[in-house]
């Protein structure tokens, strides 16, 4: 949620910054609502003061033995007017809050201007894509030939965009997740967490999935007037970030770094017809997520660090990748700046996203009331949150299968994973 001060004191500049990411701010409506808010606030405060004054007069008149019936009647009328004004104020505040919840975060000045992904800016490339002296196969053909990827059974059990893995491919998938967790906890300073896969609506509002992305969620019951019930997590960002909800940390506690390996569940409502083959876009997929809670002055430094942690996984797996900074029109709803890491997939002859690392600033913290108390200060301040994939496990499996394939269809196991595979060096 945006700082209300931006909407009250600098609405024109805020509108321009939001326009750079394709969002049209209704300045006229907001100005009208703000004017109503000011009037209602003054009315409420005036009526409250009058009621307090009349209450004193009643007490004084009673002491003098006077008839206080007229004063009590007047107080009753004031009370009714005050209750009505408070109700109007609450309804208006809810309307303003609803609008605020629909607004994306303000892009940072270092994010390049642009309309869509075609205007993202490449920062670097790492590693050289391998040149094969045979016709490369994609991960679907490789996995099915090794009896490790079973899409037919998944369709029978659940439908499209699901997968059944078996044998050594399933073990390789598990090994990737274990390796990522070990790297982040043993070398990058993260605390491993086990979190719920079902979350409530408050958690989803807190991290920004609601109200905008409700259609992308799997819910345990249909939406009702009372709410949507519980939802399967679209990413571990939701439960991990909600660890900070209504918390006040000491400054010395920061930064806090959390990581978790979870399945993620997405309806992919807006992805009809895209990536229908293979593991690239699934309703259920595994991901190792990284989340940080940091001092506001250090969040952009933390973004570079967190992105580097995701990059290290790719480097250690010897997977060629490129790093891009997203333009304003392609950033996620809550991000103020985002880096994407894209891994090389030989069968597609292109780089594909495997990690997205974002500085959210105080956007989530304001919704969550996630705060810290600066050393020597009495008043707590909002902290900054960051998140990133470290990495998407299924897409990493795709990259390993395709980049480490041999001419006979077998798969060489990356050296750093062999200890997780019982010393196995090849599959097939």
Curated annotation (Swiss-Prot):
InterPro entries: aa-tRNA-synt_IIb (IPR002314), aa-tRNA-synth_II (IPR006195), aa-tRNA-synth_II/BPL/LPL (IPR045864), Ser-tRNA-ligase_type_1 (IPR002317), Ser-tRNA-synth_1_N (IPR015866), SerRS_1_N_sf (IPR042103), SerRS_core (IPR033729), tRNA-bd_arm (IPR010978). Catalyzes the attachment of serine to tRNA(Ser). Is also able to aminoacylate tRNA(Sec) with serine, to form the misacylated tRNA L-seryl-tRNA(Sec), which will be further converted into selenocysteinyl-tRNA(Sec). The gene is serS. Homodimer. The tRNA molecule binds across the dimer. It catalyses: tRNA(Ser) + L-serine + ATP = L-seryl-tRNA(Ser) + AMP + diphosphate + H(+); tRNA(Sec) + L-serine + ATP = L-seryl-tRNA(Sec) + AMP + diphosphate + H(+). GO terms for cellular component: cytoplasm. It comes from the Bacteria. It is an enzyme of class 6 (ligase). One of its GO terms (biological process) is seryl-tRNA aminoacylation. Belongs to the class-II aminoacyl-tRNA synthetase family. Type-1 seryl-tRNA synthetase subfamily. ATP binds at residues 266-268, 353-356. It comes from Psychromonas ingrahamii (strain DSM 17664 / CCUG 51855 / 37). Pfam families: Seryl_tRNA_N, tRNA-synt_2b. One of its GO terms (molecular function) is serine-tRNA ligase activity. L-serine binds at residues 235-237, 289, 389. Pathway: Aminoacyl-tRNA biosynthesis; selenocysteinyl-tRNA(Sec) biosynthesis; L-seryl-tRNA(Sec) from L-serine and tRNA(Sec): step 1/1. Its EC number is 6.1.1.11. This is Serine--tRNA ligase. The keyword Zinc-finger does not apply. It is found in: Cytoplasm. Keywords: Aminoacyl-tRNA synthetase, ATP-binding, Cytoplasm, Ligase, Nucleotide-binding, Protein biosynthesis. HAMAP family: Ser_tRNA_synth_type1. Consists of two distinct domains, a catalytic core and a N-terminal extension that is involved in tRNA binding.
């Amino acid at each position: 949620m945006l700082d209300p001060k931006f909407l009250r004191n600098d609405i024109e500049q805020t509108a321009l910054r939001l326009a750079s990411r394709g969002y049209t701010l209704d300045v006229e409506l907001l100005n009208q609502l703000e004017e109503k808010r000011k009037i209602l606030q003054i009315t409420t405060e005036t009526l409250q003061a009058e009621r307090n004054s009349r209450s004193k007069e009643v007490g004084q008149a009673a002491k003098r033995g006077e008839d206080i019936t007229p004063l009590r009647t007047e107080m009753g009328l004031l009370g009714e007017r005050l209750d009505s004004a408070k109700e109007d104020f609450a309804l208006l505040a809810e309307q303003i809050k609803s609008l605020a919840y629909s607004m994306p975060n303000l892009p940072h000045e270092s994010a390049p201007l642009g309309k869509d992904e075609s205007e993202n800016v490449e920062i670097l490339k790492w590693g050289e894509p391998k040149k094969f002296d045979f016709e490369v196969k994609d991960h679907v053909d490789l996995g099915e030939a090794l009896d490790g990827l079973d899409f037919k059974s998944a369709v029978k059990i659940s439908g499209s965009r699901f997968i059944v893995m078996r044998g050594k491919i399933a073990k390789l998938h598990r090994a990737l997740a274990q390796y990522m967790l070990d790297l982040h906890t043993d070398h990058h300073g993260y605390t491993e967490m086990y979190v719920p896969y079902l979350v409530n609506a408050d958690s989803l509002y807190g991290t920004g999935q609601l109200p905008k992305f409700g259609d992308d969620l799997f819910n345990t019951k249909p939406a009702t007037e009372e709410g949507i019930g519980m939802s399967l997590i679209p990413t571990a960002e939701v439960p991990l970030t909600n660890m900070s909800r209504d918390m006040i940390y000491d400054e010395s506690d920061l930064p806090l770094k959390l990581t978790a390996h979870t399945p993620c569940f997405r309806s992919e409502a807006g992805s009809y017809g895209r990536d229908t083959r293979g593991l690239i876009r699934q309703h259920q997929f595994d991901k190792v997520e990284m989340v940080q809670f940091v001092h506001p002055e250090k969040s952009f430094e933390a973004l570079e660090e967190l992105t580097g942690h995701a990059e290290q996984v790719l480097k250690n797996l010897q997977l060629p990748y490129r790093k891009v900074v997203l333009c304003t029109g392609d950033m996620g709803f809550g991000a103020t700046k985002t880096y994407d890491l894209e891994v090389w997939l030989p069968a597609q002859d292109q780089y594909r996203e495997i990690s997205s690392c974002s500085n959210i600033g105080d956007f989530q913290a304001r919704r969550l009331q996630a705060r810290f108390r600066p050393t020597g200060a009495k008043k707590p301040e909002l902290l900054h949150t960051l998140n990133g994939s470290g990495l998407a496990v299924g897409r990493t499996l795709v990259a390993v299968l395709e980049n480490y394939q041999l001419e006979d269809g077998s798969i060489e196991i990356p050296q750093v994973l062999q200890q997780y595979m019982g010393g196995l060096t090849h599959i097939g």
